Every structure is written in C-alpha cells, then in structure tokens.
C-alpha cells in the first residue's frame, strides 16, 4: 500500500480587520481575537475567536473568515460583528439566606462604558458614554441583618496597556447578635493577564477599611470589647488567579480554578492593626453523561486553606475566618462552626475545609438534586488544626434555577446532617439560599 500525501500551504496571519462595530472601539473587540499578525494560521483559533466574541455582552452575532492576504502564504482575517444596541442592565429583586437574614437587591451594570465618549452635540446621545469596554457596577443590598452598598469601576486597558485597573468603594453593616459592625471600604488594584484567554492573572491591590464596632451587649465576646470603637485598616493585597473553566446557569462551572491571596497590614502600610493573612482555594468540576451542559451530571471538588497571624496582638475578630451556613459549610449554623465566646462566634486564624458534591438534572434542567459531603476545621491558630477535630457533614438537597420575567432566580435547599462536631458548634439540619446573587 502506498500513500501519497499532498501537503497544503502553511499560512501566516496578515491583517486583522473588524467590521460592524459602530459603537464599540476596535481595541475592545481585538482583545477577543486569538489570531495575531505574523503568527501561524490555525483554523481552530477562528472558532475560538468567534466564541469569545459571542461571550461579550455587546456582541449579538459574529462571523470570522479568512481572505487572501498580500503574500502567497498570507491570510487576512475578517471579523464581522453585529452589536447589541442596549446592553446595560437593571436588576431588582431580593432573597434570603439561613442565618444571614432577608435582603433586597438592586444592581445596575454597564459592561461597555466609555467615560471619555462625551456627546458631541445636544442630540448626540445614542452612543454617548458607550463603546470603551469599561465596566461600571452598582449594587444596593439592604437587609435585616446584613446590608451592603458598593460601586465598582474597571478600566481593562489602563493607559492603553495590557494591564487592567479597578476601583471599588462601599459601605456595609452587620448585626452580629451581641454587637454591631460597620465598614466604609475602598480598594484599588492593577491586574495583569498572562494569556489572551484571560486564564492566568496576577493582581496587586491596596485596601482601606474604616471599621466601627458598637452597640455591644453585656455578654458580647471579650474580643469585641478589645476592638470597640473605630479602627482603620490599610494593606496591600497580592492575588494570583488561574481559571480554566466555563459556566452554565443551570449546572454551574466546568473546569479548574485556583486562587492564591496574600494580605500584609502594618504601620508601614498605614494600618492601625498589624497582621499577615494568606488564603488558597482550589475548585474542580467535570460534567458527565450528556453533550448539552445544562443536562450533564456534575462532580465538584473544592478545598480552601487559610492562615493569618497578628504581629504583637491578635487579629481583630472582624478580619478572621468563619465557617458555617449554606455558603461555606452546610450542616452548621451561619458562622457558628469553630471558636465561640459564650453564644457568639469569634472566628479563627487557621482554616482548612473542603467539599465534594454531585448533581444531576431531574426531568428538567431547572431542577437538580445533589448529594454533598463537607469536611474541615477552624481553630484559633493554624497550629491547632487537627484531624481529630475535623467536622464532617453529609446530605443532599435541590438546586433550583428559574427565569421569571427575564430575571434569573436561583435557589439552593440543603438537608445536611453533621456527622462529627465539637461542643462549641451549632448544628443545623436545613438551610437555604434564595434570590439574586447567591
């Protein structure tokens, strides 16, 4: 048998042209183009480019094709897009969380802002303040026990570089049963992505937080009396992220994500409290038994490792790690796994915990039963973490995902039984989250 192979020409990318973007600047769409002039042409990257464009909120449809370039082995890339005319969103809703109380929710989001695109005349308002790829987000979350109000702005091309710049500010109020806690907080960060898919990034930020602890009851913990009044915290944050994952509204994420975070506060950073804190998280999810993401069975494994230590004095209780409740450790009441002073949780400086869960669609993708196993320990110091004190919990529940009048309504119901606990813990068989942003 003789095989004859006729090898096609090897092409390189020539020019990349973008058409159809009457509102959005070219550089905003070019960040999604996986092909660069001068590099070898790979056909799979044409589809990658199209998929990335379709993930942008400002793109309604996209086509990517090759045409003959200036040389015999040169292929130009033509990108044709159709823009959405209105992409800003206003969300209004509410929800509840076992232990954290009920909340209202108002969110305004504009993912394609341009602060420097001012109207050129009194009638030029259709494209004003649009097309720059900047992001503005406002969130108002008033609640019965916890309230948060924040604003966030992101410039993805800081001074036309590959760095993004973000600034965040807001206030928060928390009712901790035996005392109250207020925050006025601001943060700024510069982030560098190391690949065009925005999978690996390194961010350097600075956080300032004015904290007030007040309205202490007689039985409030001693740690709360130690920090009563106003305290100013200021510290840099270094954060390394890896995210090789996609997400489906009904069935959740697929792939791998990891986070390494380091905070260091002290006199030199402008903080009234000295401490060092590190956090590492890992999450991996895989789908099975279906080609359509929303119909897949999903196995998820996650783990978190936290350490902090004060320099000369304990870390304030409002900066410590807490576990318990449906968001962090179902089977235990909200924040009530781990160290307590009387009836009030005071958190810990050493945290190790993880989860394994398995979910699948039941008749419809909106309804997903799941089984869950939780494990972990929270102690006053990392050196006190012990497998003999590991808490474990097992159970199941329902993930419900609905769209009502265009509004996404997620709800999670947990029936989880603690298998191993300590005397200071507060167990909880049923817990739930309901509403937006849970």
Model-derived segments and their meaning:
Residues 55, 70, 77, 86-101, ...:
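C-terminal outer-membrane beta-barrel translocator/porin domains of Gram-negative envelope proteins
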Residues 142-230:
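Transmembrane beta-barrel wall of Gram-negative outer-membrane proteins
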Residues 11-15, 162, 199-201, 249-250:
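Solvent-exposed, non-transmembrane alpha-helical starts
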């Amino acid at each position: 048998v003789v095989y004859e192979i006729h090898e096609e020409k090897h092409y390189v990318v020539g020019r990349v042209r973008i058409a159809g973007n009457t509102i959005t600047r070219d550089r905003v769409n070019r960040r999604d183009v996986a092909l660069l002039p001068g590099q070898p042409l790979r056909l799979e990257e044409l589809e990658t480019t199209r998929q990335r464009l379709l993930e942008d909120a400002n793109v309604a449809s996209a086509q990517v094709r090759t045409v003959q370039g200036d040389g015999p082995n040169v292929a130009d890339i033509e990108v044709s897009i159709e823009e959405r005319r209105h992409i800003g969103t206003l969300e209004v809703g509410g929800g509840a969380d076992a232990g954290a109380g009920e909340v209202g929710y108002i969110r305004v989001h504009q993912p394609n802002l341009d602060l420097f695109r001012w109207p050129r005349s009194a009638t030029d308002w259709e494209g004003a303040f649009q097309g720059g790829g900047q992001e503005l987000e406002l969130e108002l979350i008033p609640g019965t026990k916890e309230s948060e109000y924040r604003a966030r702005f992101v410039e993805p091309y800081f001074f036309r570089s590959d760095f993004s710049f973000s600034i965040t500010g807001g206030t928060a109020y928390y009712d901790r049963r035996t005392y109250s806690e207020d925050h006025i907080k601001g943060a700024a960060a510069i982030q560098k992505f190391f690949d065009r898919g925005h999978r690996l990034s390194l961010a350097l930020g600075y956080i300032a937080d004015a904290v007030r602890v007040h309205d202490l009851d007689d039985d409030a913990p001693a740690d709360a009396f130690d920090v009563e009044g106003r305290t100013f915290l200021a510290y840099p944050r270094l954060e390394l992220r890896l995210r090789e994952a996609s997400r489906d509204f009904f069935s959740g994420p697929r792939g791998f994500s990891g986070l390494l975070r380091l905070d260091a506060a002290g006199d030199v950073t402008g903080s009234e409290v000295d401490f060092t804190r590190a956090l590492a998280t890992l999450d991996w999810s895989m789908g099975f038994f279906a080609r359509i993401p929303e119909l897949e069975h999903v196995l998820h494994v996650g783990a978190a490792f936290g350490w902090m230590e004060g320099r000369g004095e304990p870390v304030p209780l409002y900066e410590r790690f807490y576990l318990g409740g449906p968001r962090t450790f179902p089977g235990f009441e909200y924040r009530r796994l781990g160290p307590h002073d009387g009836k009030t949780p005071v958190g810990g400086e050493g945290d190790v915990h993880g989860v394994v869960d398995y979910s699948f669609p039941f008749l419809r993708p909106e309804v997903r039963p799941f089984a869950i196993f939780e494990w972990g320990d929270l102690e006053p110091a990392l050196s006190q973490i012990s497998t003999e004190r590991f808490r474990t919990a097992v159970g199941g529940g329902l993930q419900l995902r609905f769209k009502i009048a265009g509004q996404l309504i997620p709800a999670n119901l947990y029936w989880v039984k603690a298998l191993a606990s300590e005397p200071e813990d507060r167990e909880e068989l049923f817990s739930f989250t309901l509403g937006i942003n849970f």
